[in-house]
């Protein structure tokens, strides 16, 4: 049994509104993405010709206005920077460079068709989307850093986050096309015009509900992975509408042209989560509470959430130093847990990881508390070193020798990886990159309630969307 190939799901996210004259500067000092137009380099000669093309960004972007967002990719050899009104993926770190939360950041509003959001366009405004489990802690952090900044920070429980995806080649091509047409502008004026055209052309949304769409983003954490949007009304199916006036019927959400070309079923959020796990896309709520993770361990550089030249922000020093050193030792990899049989081992050697909710290992793993997952030992599949026996010493009636013993010596085991999260027979595991390059099949030791231990297999997947080193 797999997750659905297509669907629309509501996400368990909280939305925080950040608005005011200093909103752009305030957020730029907290998130790992660049919001200000200046390029920061310690040495002028390190600015490449490609980067020099954007030296006039400060003339194009007025940060005191609601200009949208900059989009950049640190792995783009042409160093393209686009200005548009769709959202971006980012992270917020603590002072030690550890991840507080990942997030999506949207310009507020996305569009201004028929001047419906004209009042909001008068000053910088953003929607910060985070997992509901972290929202209260994040509010405390934001207020702590506010100081004298002229910003209003308000959680808005009347905003709703949704996710749509379609795992067909047709949708992938469609998504590529609309990005090229509507979200590759080079200045704020064109960015707003393109966003308005996206609504007026009935590309995705039905224009009749345009006043309800506050945020929009193409999820490019994985290229063309899906669409995210924020509405000011909940979306309902025919079954649960019950004549409510304060909802958007799902059949009224999508444009006629989109509905004719693509399926639009509603699904549970669990389908979105399973799809993330299979593709190796980590989110901070996947980890147990209190986990201490670095942004590169979470693959932030691979998911378009990092700017290298934006200047100072909280946690920047360790992050940039790690990148400049060029060595990232550990990353979170997607894995599949399986029963250790010769057939399974042989099959998975040549096949990608895959969701199987009926696999017996699902029950085995469900008996392990989340707090204990990280303590389980992952070792090489052929790790069967014999016990070492010390040479016997001469027996003495008086005392045992302090220099030797016939006692069996067990070599201390060292786990090669740490389980971050488990979903059915899939998981996310922290592993050394060098170990995965050598081997992708491991075994996991589980405690047995019947006494002793049991082992299950672990197949590590290397996502095909990761950049080639």
UniProtKB/Swiss-Prot annotation:
Localization of this protein: Mitochondrion matrix
Assigned GO CC terms: mitochondrial matrix
Record-linked Gene3D superfamilies: 2.40.30.160, Probable tRNA modification gtpase trme, domain 1 (3.30.1360.120)
Region (Disordered): 376-406
Main location: mitochondrion
Stated family: Belongs to the GcvT family. CAF17/IBA57 subfamily.
The protein, known as: Iron-sulfur cluster assembly factor IBA57 homolog, mitochondrial
């Amino acid at each position: 049994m797999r997750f659905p190939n297509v669907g629309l799901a509501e996400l368990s996210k909280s939305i925080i509104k950040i608005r005011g004259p200093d909103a752009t500067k305030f957020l730029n000092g907290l998130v790992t993405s660049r919001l200000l137009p200046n390029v920061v380099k310690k040495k002028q000669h390190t600015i490449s010709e490609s980067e020099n093309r954007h030296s006039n960004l400060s003339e194009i972007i007025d940060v005191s206005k609601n200009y949208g967002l900059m989009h950049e990719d640190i792995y783009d050899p042409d160093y393209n920077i686009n200005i548009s009104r769709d959202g971006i993926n980012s992270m917020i770190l603590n002072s030690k460079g550890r991840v507080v939360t990942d997030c999506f950041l949207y310009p507020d509003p996305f569009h201004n068709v028929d001047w419906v959001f004209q009042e909001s366009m008068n000053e910088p405004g953003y929607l910060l989307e985070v997992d509901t489990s972290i929202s209260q802690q994040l509010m405390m952090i934001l207020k702590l850093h506010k100081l004298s900044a002229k910003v209003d920070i308000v959680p808005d429980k009347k905003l709703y986050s949704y996710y749509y995806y379609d795992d067909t080649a047709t949708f992938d091509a469609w998504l590529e096309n609309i990005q090229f047409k509507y979200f590759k502008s080079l200045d704020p004026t064109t960015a707003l015009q393109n966003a308005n055209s996206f609504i007026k052309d009935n590309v995705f949304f039905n224009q009749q509900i345009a006043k309800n769409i506050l945020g929009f983003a193409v999820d490019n954490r994985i290229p063309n992975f899906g669409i995210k949007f924020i509405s000011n009304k909940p979306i309902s199916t025919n079954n649960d509408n019950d004549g409510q006036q304060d909802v958007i019927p799902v059949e009224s959400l999508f444009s006629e042209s989109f509905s004719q070309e693509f399926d639009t079923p509603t699904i549970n959020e669990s389908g979105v989560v399973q799809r993330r796990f299979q593709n190796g896309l980590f989110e901070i709520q996947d980890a147990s509470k209190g986990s201490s993770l670095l942004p590169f361990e979470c693959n932030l550089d691979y998911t378009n959430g990092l700017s290298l030249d934006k200047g100072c922000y909280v946690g920047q020093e360790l992050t940039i130093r790690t990148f400049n050193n060029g060595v990232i030792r550990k990353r979170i990899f997607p894995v599949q847990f399986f029963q250790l049989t010769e057939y399974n081992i042989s099959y998975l050697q040549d096949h990608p990881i895959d969701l199987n909710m009926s696999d017996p290992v699902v029950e085995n793993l469900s008996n392990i508390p989340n707090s204990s997952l990280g303590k389980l030992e992952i070792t090489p599949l052929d790790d069967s070193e014999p016990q070492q026996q010390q040479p016997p010493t001469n027996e003495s009636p008086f005392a045992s020798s302090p220099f030797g013993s016939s006692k069996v010596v067990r070599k201390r085991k060292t786990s090669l990886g740490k389980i971050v999260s488990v979903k059915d027979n899939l998981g996310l595991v922290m592993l050394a990159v060098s170990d995965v390059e050598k081997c992708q099949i491991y075994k996991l030791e589980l405690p047995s309630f019947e006494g002793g231990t049991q082992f299950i297999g672990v197949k590590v997947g290397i996502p095909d969307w990761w950049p080639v080193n």
